Amino acid sequence: MQTSQLHKFIIRLSFLGANFSGWQIQNNAPTIQGEIMKGLHYFLDRKSPLIVGAGRTDAGVHAINFFAHFEFYNQYLDTNNLLYNLNRFLPDNIVIHSIKLVSSDFHARFSAISRKYEYLVSTKKDPFLINRAFYFYKELDLELMNLASNMLLGHKNCSSFSKSNYDNSICNIQSAYWFKSKNMLIFSIESNRFLYNMVRCIVGTLIDVGLKKINLEDFTNIIESNNRSNAGFSVPAYGLYLSDVKYPKKYIL
């Protein structure tokens, strides 16, 4: 039964971003949002509202646990059937894990309380990691990099790590650390929000710390300068993964 009232549904998905121009729909460029919209239009309604994502990942960036919502007139939508059909319709580098009815006050972007990213640095050349991890052969001091990472928690203005001008550059970074897994160095960072290119710039600057090109005092000065030109290089997008998005517990996702 359809009514004039719209009902909200949440999608949980994963994607490899190497062949896409990011999440947000664009003219004449393949995007994650664009591909899912095609599927929703095909199986539901040509006039179905735009799907809204938890964030706007850049070109080449991947996502392990991404959320988006859309609205539809029928609250009794067969979500299992839609899940099956969408996964058949979508390219292999996008997977829908679940589709659920959610309360009307939920918003995939604005209801999120934190987002977590991981950046993968491969210390060994591996053809199976092409467009999946950043290969970096030089030896890095992981202990120094973790000391520097911890300094990020005491600073909220992150404008040193983004070229874009923001009215609000304040980010509440809740955790930032490196760990090693076999031939991989992984940087994990969680915050309530992120600026454009912020994680990739932080990783590049921390690599400079690991190479001992800059010391811990230099790193602190870079943060406090609020000037992107003082920070290090931006690592490639293909090593970056949105690994999780957290929402208030009242939303059962």
Walk through the language-model features, giving the residues of each.
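Structured-RNA-binding interfaces characteristic of tRNA pseudouridine synthases
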Residues: 1-253
